[in-house]
Amino acid sequence: MAAVVAMDTQLMLGVGLIEKDSNGEALWVWCYPSTTASLRNLLLRKCCLTDENKLLHPFVFGQYRRTWFYVTTVEVPDSSVLKKVTHFSIVLTAKDFNPEKYAAFTRILCRIYLKYGSPVKMMESYIAVLTKGICQSEENGSFLSRDFDGRKAYLAGSIKDIVSQFGMETVILHTALMLKKRIVVYHPKIEAVQEFTRTLPALVWHRQDWTILHSYMHLHAEELEGLQMCTGYIAGFVELEVSNRPDLYDVFVNLADSEITIAPLAKEAMTMGKLHKEIGQLIVQSAEDPEKSDSQVIQDIALKTKEIFTHLAPFSEVSDDGGKVILNVEALKQQRFPPATENFLYHLAAAEQMLKV
C-alpha cells in the first residue's frame, strides 16, 4: 500500500474548479495548488463551458507538454446548494495516462461539490487520495487508487473496432507509428476522437509509450507549438480546418468519413510493399477472429513487430565507441530486399535512432 501512496503523491499534480453562472459566463474559480496562467487558459478552452455550441461533454482528457488533464463537467440541478451556477467542471492534472482512474475520482469530487458547494470539502478528498491513495464516503462514493492499473488504461480501447472500420488500411497507421510519424485524427465529436486516438499506441505495444498521445487539441498557437516540439505524435481534433494544415501531419485520419491520407512529403518513407501487405493481412486476420480478445490481437501485432526487428538484427552493429547499436546501411543494401522493404527498414532504423550521424 505504501508504494501506491508514494506513487499517487508523485503522479497527481493539481485540482481545479471552473463554473458557469446564470449569465452564461465561465470562470476559473479555484485551484489547489496554484497553476500557471497558460495552463489555466488551456483548461478553460478544454472544458466545454466556454463552447458556443452549448454541447455538454461529461468527460474529456488530453495532454499538454507532458501534463495530463482530465475534466468532468456536470449540470447543476435546481435542488443543489449552488445558486446562480448552472454548470461546473472539475479538472485534475497528473503525470500519468489513466482516464478511467481520473474519471472515477472527478465524479466523486463533483458529487462532493454539488452537496456542499465548497471547494474545501473537495480539497480534503484530494489530499486524502494524494497522501493515502484512498477517499471514502458513504454518500459520495469511495475511491481507491490501486484499483486502477496503468496497463489496463493502455488496453481499454478496441483495436478490433479500428480494424473493422479501416481494414487493410490499418497497416498505414501501424507503419506511421513504427516510423514515429505525425498522425492527426479528425472527427466532429470529441468522444469519438478520444476513443480512437487512445487506442492507437497499442499498435506499437513494444514501446508502451502513451506520451505520444494528444487526444484533445485545438488549433491554438500555444498548443501547436508544444505539439510541434514532439518528433512523432497522435493528435486529435474536432476542428475540420486541421485538414488544411499539412504542416501538422504525415498521416491524416478523417474518422467521420473513414478516410486515411498520407501527406505528399511522407509518401517516400511510407511506401508500402510486400512486407506491409503481410503485416496488414495479419492485423486483419487476427482482429476478425471472434475467438480473440483485443489484448490477444495486440499480442499478435507485437509478435509480428518483433519479427520485423529481427530483419534489422543481421545489419546492426555496435558503434565504434562501444555505445549504441547502429545500422550498417551497406550490409542492408547488399541483402537486396524488395525496394519498399529496404526503404521501410532504413526509416525504421532512423526512427529507432540506429543511423550513424
Curated annotation (Swiss-Prot):
uDENN domain span: 1-136
Give the stretches traversing the membrane. none
Where does the secretion signal sit in this chain?
none
Q: Which GO terms describe its cellular component?
A: late endosome
What biological process terms from GO does the record include? endosome transport via multivesicular body sorting pathway; protein transport; regulation of early endosome to late endosome transport
Q: Where in the cell is it found?
A: Late endosome
The residue ranges of the cDENN domain are 152-299
Keyword vocabulary terms for this entry: Endosome, Guanine-nucleotide releasing factor
Q: Which GO terms describe its molecular function?
A: guanyl-nucleotide exchange factor activity; small GTPase binding
List each copy of the dDENN domain by range: 301-357
Task: Name the InterPro entries for this protein.
Answer: FAM45 (IPR042431), Tripartite_DENN (IPR037516)
Give yes or no: UniProt keyword Secreted: no
**What family does this belong to?**
Belongs to the DENND10 family.
On subunit structure and binding partners, the annotation says: Interacts with the coiled-coil heterodimer of CCDC22 and CCDC93; the interaction is direct. Interacts with RAB27A and RAB27B (GDP-bound forms preferentially).
Q: What does the UniProt function comment say about this protein?
A: Guanine nucleotide exchange factor (GEF) regulating homeostasis of late endocytic pathway, including endosomal positioning, maturation and secretion, possibly through activating Rab proteins such as RAB27A and RAB27B. Promotes the exchange of GDP to GTP, converting inactive GDP-bound RAB27A and RAB27B into their active GTP-bound form.
Q: Can you say what this protein is called?
A: DENN domain-containing protein 10
Q: Which organism is it from?
A: Mus musculus (Mouse)
